[in-house]
């Protein structure tokens, strides 16, 4: 019999992502000055200490109250979505856990520091991608997983009709 909710997996996933996110940001803040950069893989990956008081690409810089309110709403919506829409679907529950962990990780930074610590600096196919962190990666992977699940469900539902 399939379990309705995989709470322990979801909580563990959220906890692991949050720990890696917060510890990595702490290590960056204690060991590097803003702007310091270390090349890890030439022409591909650097660790660069950066701060962002906005969202992706620095949009809405300095709008902390907005981010506090929106993040709290998003976290509540994710919990509701998990309960109402993710029953019996481990993949969707993992996706929501990744989204929750990513949103919470950056929220913690905003509350404690007034900005988000970013440090993963990549050059992908010649494009100097904006600097990001583990929470951002978790959000991105979570969104991809949600999209995959929705497409898969749409295909299955179409076959059943």
Curated annotation (Swiss-Prot):
Pathway terms, separated by semicolons: Protein modification; lipoprotein biosynthesis (signal peptide cleavage)
Protein name per UniProt: Lipoprotein signal peptidase
Role played: This protein specifically catalyzes the removal of signal peptides from prolipoproteins.
Enzyme Commission number, as recorded: 3.4.23.36
Transmembrane regions: 9-29, 63-83, 88-108, 131-151
Residues annotated as catalytic: 118, 136
NCBIfam families documented for this protein: lspA (TIGR00077)
Annotated Gene Ontology cellular component terms: plasma membrane
Provenance organism: Staphylococcus epidermidis (strain ATCC 35984 / DSM 28319 / BCRC 17069 / CCUG 31568 / BM 3577 / RP62A)
Recorded name of the encoding gene: lspA
Pfam families referenced in this protein's UniProt entry, alphabetically: Peptidase_A8
């Amino acid at each position: 019999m399939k379990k309705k909710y995989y709470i322990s997996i979801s909580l563990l996933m959220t906890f692991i992502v949050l720990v890696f996110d917060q510890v990595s940001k702490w290590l960056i803040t204690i060991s590097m000055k803003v702007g310091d950069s270390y090349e890890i893989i030439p022409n591909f990956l650097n660790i660069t200490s950066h701060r962002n008081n906005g969202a992706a690409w620095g949009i809405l810089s300095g709008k902390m109250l907005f981010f506090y309110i929106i993040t709290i709403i998003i976290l509540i919506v994710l919990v509701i979505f998990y309960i109402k829409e993710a029953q019996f679907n481990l993949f969707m529950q993992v996706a929501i856990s990744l989204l929750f962990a990513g949103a919470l990780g950056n929220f913690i930074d905003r509350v404690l520091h007034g900005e988000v610590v970013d440090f993963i600096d990549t050059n992908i196919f010649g494009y100097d991608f904006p600097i990001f962190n583990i929470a951002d990666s978790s959000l991105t992977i979570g969104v991809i997983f949600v999209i995959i699940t929705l497409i898969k469900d749409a295909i299955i539902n179409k076959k059943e009709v």
